[in-house]
Amino acid sequence: MSSATELDGASVCIQVGTTTEMNLADYFKANGMSYESVPVETNSEADAAYLAGRCDIYTTDASGLYASRAGYPDPSAHIVLPEIISKEPLGPSVRHGDSEWADIVRWSLNAMIIAEEKGITSTNVDEMKNSKDPETLRLLGVSKVGDTGKGYGAWLGLDDDWAYNIIKQVGNYSESFEKHIGVNTPINIARGLNALYKDCLLYTSPSPRDKC
């Protein structure tokens, strides 16, 4: 089997009450196929039911499928089919009402995405402090924002080298992705739709100046 279009008549373990349940129904209907639903309450229950043979396939967010497969006794005996039947971006979340912390979390991620766009990595970030690109210099805390006399960190309650420290210690978005969940890890996820907009895909970030 190499495609979800071959799943007519399959039994599917699916977590009830989720958007995945609705997306699956739409996909099968749009492709003129039928399926037998095997309802479960949690991802762990879906894993157990699938491994016990209660269903032919198991569906959830793609990242969840890859993570589950990595924990199976023999991951190579299972495949994640290539079709992406819906696009539901996942990202960091914080407690409601803590807007300052939400800004820090949001811009920490954005800084890593901008760094990838600019070609800034954990290995060249010191060299990039000598860049001629104004946005790179502001991101790394070398230059201030206009005539404010302040760096981006001031609007987040952080030092101006906050983004530099993230990139130096963690890397840009690509480095972090490839290190923790990329194709050379047990989870083995390709960038796919998580690639940058300049590669004709989804990821980009606003400028920190939008925050100032």
State what each model feature region is.
Residues 1-47, 63:
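Bilobed "Venus flytrap"/periplasmic-binding protein-like clamshell domains
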Residues 11, 16-18, 64-65, 82-164, ...:
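Extended ligand-binding regions for polar small-molecule ligands
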Residues 23-30, 51-52, 56-80:
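A ligand-binding cleft/hinge motif common to bilobed small-molecule-binding domains
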Residues 36, 71-86, 96:
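Short beta-strand->loop
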Residues 45, 52-54, 212:
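Alpha-helical segments with a strong preference for the paired helices of cellulosomal dockerin domains
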Residues 178-183, 187, 197:
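Detector for small/aliphatic-rich hydrophobic stretches
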Residues 203-210:
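Conserved small/polar residues in nucleotide/adenosyl-binding loops
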